[in-house]
């Protein structure tokens, strides 16, 4: 794997039977991090089970099964390379918590690949009012995934028909436009994830296909295959210039070292000697050292999963869901309340003021009350449709005032995207998603450790 290649994260979305696993499996199998030994092992098992038509989806099923059982998988298995990028598939849906993962997800996707089955009836099912295709695309857009690639899969099942492809492009264009994407900036690639047509190499089965084009602010790019479309993703900018925000995933107590919080740097930089503040617990202390993969590093940057050692802080003072920031540069604070744009995905009844589901925002998992429904809006244009509605139901978008039932630290989506989007969970499913528009922060005194005071004097 090329160490120096730029990393991009993609999420693969689409209807249940669109062929997501086969297509993703194919890319990982052909350009990825699965070593020959593992592949041979899988092939042997497949033959023993009479699955000798060993196809790529099986690679993914194996990986998924291991992941479901909680075996941590060598993450390289979910990676593949293009000429420019090292690509990580963040999550292939079909996973129970796909929607939740996409929102609180360990990483933000830079691009979504929407897989559409072109078979007669299949396409129509996926794109119908309640189809997952629509929900996934809406979700990706709401959560700030601004780049999209559409792969029209299973072209072999419709005899590689140009008319069918054009019909699907036309329909899909209409629907992604409604969601908010600009169809001109979206490459459409006709593929067969099973046979491999237009995946890595140009197909000979569709002589009519002249290639895809996409127009963005940075110009026009063209290509033939899905791999080329992925290679044409606009390089993401990582927010190192923003103040530090690091939501804690865990806090460990390590003998001889002390308290070690662990989490992913979302914005900014963390380094030894910094005086950091944890919100909403309001503890301020000095960072003694930062490490990644059990090695000390000079600094942790956005996207890095780091552990850092803090002085004079007990494991009781800080916990998962707390947010670490620089005490001298826009430190994080507790949110007394916050206003958010919420889109209701699937709730069986009506949601009114007083509704108190659980919110998953970054690593926090806390009950929040819908204190007030401020206005109902058109989710595409943002125009107000009704002031102070009594209720909202599935499909509606509204601006809502939320109050956490326990201390919580969140930020606006505009300032700190990963801390400004959330999933609303109830009845063991994601009933809504939200993007935070404004936060009412509370100032209150907290614990300042001796180490922090000393560090402050040194300066």
Curated annotation (Swiss-Prot):
GO terms for cellular component: cytoplasm. Gene3D superfamilies: P-loop containing nucleotide triphosphate hydrolases (3.40.50.300), Translation factors (2.40.30.10). Its main location: cytoplasm. It holds the Pfam family GTP-eEF1A_C. Residues 5-240 form the tr-type G domain. Residues 91-94 are annotated as: G3. The modification N6,N6-dimethyllysine is found at residues 3, 316. Residues 14-21 are annotated as: G1. Keywords: Cytoplasm, Elongation factor, GTP-binding, Methylation, Nucleotide-binding, Protein biosynthesis. One of its GO terms (molecular function) is GTP binding. Residues 192-194 are annotated as: G5. Residues 70-74 are annotated as: G2. CDD domains: EF1_alpha (cd01883), EF1_alpha_II (cd03693), EF1_alpha_III (cd03705). Residues 153-156 are annotated as: G4. The modification N6-methyllysine is found at residues 3, 30, 316, 390. The modification N,N,N-trimethylglycine is found at residue 2. It is found in: Cytoplasm. SUPFAM superfamilies: EF-Tu/eEF-1alpha/eIF2-gamma C-terminal domain, P-loop containing nucleoside triphosphate hydrolases, Translation proteins. GTP binds at residues 14-21, 91-95, 153-156. The modification N6,N6,N6-trimethyllysine is found at residue 79. Belongs to the TRAFAC class translation factor GTPase superfamily. Classic translation factor GTPase family. EF-Tu/EF-1A subfamily. This protein promotes the GTP-dependent binding of aminoacyl-tRNA to the A-site of ribosomes during protein biosynthesis. This is Elongation factor 1-alpha. It comes from Cryptococcus neoformans var. neoformans serotype D (strain B-3501A). The gene is TEF1.
